[in-house]
Swiss-Prot record:
This is Large ribosomal subunit protein bL33B. Keywords: Ribonucleoprotein, Ribosomal protein. GO terms for cellular component: cytoplasm; ribonucleoprotein complex; ribosome. Belongs to the bacterial ribosomal protein bL33 family. The gene is rpmG2. GO terms for molecular function: structural constituent of ribosome. Coiled coil: none annotated. The keyword Signal does not apply.
Length: 48
């Protein structure tokens, strides 16, 4: 079964991106993505 991982902006805490993975990663994922609320590229952390 695939797990749903939601990425949350580190600055404004808005939930912007969703990803589905078959396995849960061992470490926390940090991805540099564009945030609509901040209007810039920020770090996004995963939240299970």
């Amino acid at each position: 079964m695939r797990k749903k991982i939601i990425f949350v902006c580190q600055d404004c805490l808005s939930r912007n991106y969703v990803k589905r993975w078959t396995k849960q990663p061992l470490q926390r994922l940090i991805i540099n993505k564009y945030c609509k609320q901040c209007n810039q590229k920020t770090k996004h952390l995963d939240s299970f």
